[in-house]
Amino acid sequence: MSERNNRKVYTGKVVSDKMDKTITVVVETYKTHSLYGKRVKYSKKYKAHDENNTAKMGDIVKIMETRPLSATKRFRLVEVVEESVII
């Protein structure tokens, strides 16, 4: 059971919810340049499993690493942290 606690958990923004039971989440993070020490912002997209299609585009969500669910899905939706405002 201790392995479950070692799984990566990311918070990001949903940029696509067009697939069935799958969302695309962009996670922004900072990395320090090895020589100059400047913090550089970069982003990465992850596909995550959304069993009930609860997350919508623009939502802030929390995703957790899991076993491979398809060729590209290695994460699952944990919770919707903040829902997007639709105008």
Curated annotation (Swiss-Prot):
What GO terms in the biological process aspect are recorded for it? translation
| This protein's GO CC annotations | cytosolic small ribosomal subunit
Q: Spell out the CDD domains in the cross-references.
A: Ribosomal_uS17
Q: Print the keywords alphabetically.
A: Ribonucleoprotein, Ribosomal protein, RNA-binding, rRNA-binding
MF terms from GO for this chain are: rRNA binding; structural constituent of ribosome
Read off the InterPro entries from this record: NA-bd_OB-fold (IPR012340), Ribosomal_uS17 (IPR000266), Ribosomal_uS17_bact/chlr (IPR019984), Ribosomal_uS17_CS (IPR019979)
User: By its UniProt entry, which Pfam families does this protein fall under?
Assistant: Ribosomal_S17
Q: Which domain of life is it from?
A: Bacteria
> Which PROSITE patterns has this protein been placed in?
RIBOSOMAL_S17 (PS00056)
Q: What family does the entry list?
A: Belongs to the universal ribosomal protein uS17 family.
Q: How does it assemble?
A: Part of the 30S ribosomal subunit.
Entry function: One of the primary rRNA binding proteins, it binds specifically to the 5'-end of 16S ribosomal RNA.
Protein name, as recorded: Small ribosomal subunit protein uS17
Which species does this protein come from?
Macrococcus caseolyticus (strain JCSC5402)
